[in-house]
Amino acid sequence: VVFYATYFENIAISYDSTAAKVVICGTDGNNNHGYGIVGTVSGTAISFGSAVAFATGSGAASTSTSYNLQADKTVIIYGDTSNSGYPTVKIATLSGTSISFGSAVVVQNAAGSWIGSVYDSSNAKTIFSYVDNGNSNSSYGTIIVGTVSGTSISFGTAVVFSSKNTEYITSTFDSSNNKVVLAYAASDNTSSCRHCFWKCNIVRDGVGFSCGKPS
């Protein structure tokens, strides 16, 4: 089933368990605008609502989405190419097959790439990971905690989890051990750490992290 009738990239998907809908986000390859689309699954079939833009202007890059169960909101993070590639979050609200977005909130005032998100159900927080491409920690893997309230979000302090050239970050939440697990590739001039896993635990009232050693 075609859900977007032109070139579409940077695709990510999440599931809204309250609305029983999937949310797909990505970038139009022609105008680079970021769009969100709601999907309804019925048996082995799926249907879609209309695409709604969450990023216009120069568009979006490296999109990711996750569902925050406590807030009952879908969270979208993307690189805002209209704002120097800064990692930016918008909170989405679903109504049937329609989707709308709150105001943009910048995660950091520097470019980011390999952007991802995951929901920590133990702490009811949305966890964002990205490569910091613009600060003194350029190319370092970075993680930050987000607290969703309505269509707003606030952030804790960003923590570096990889002080090497980092890429291909992906993450999941281990509900048995209440840990965020990151998988990523990292390298330096000696290629001493190429494929790593790092387990992180939220501390300090759910706005900070402690991380174990990569293996």
Ranges and model annotations:
Residues 1-215:
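Extracellular, repeat-based ectodomains that mediate carbohydrate processing or recognition
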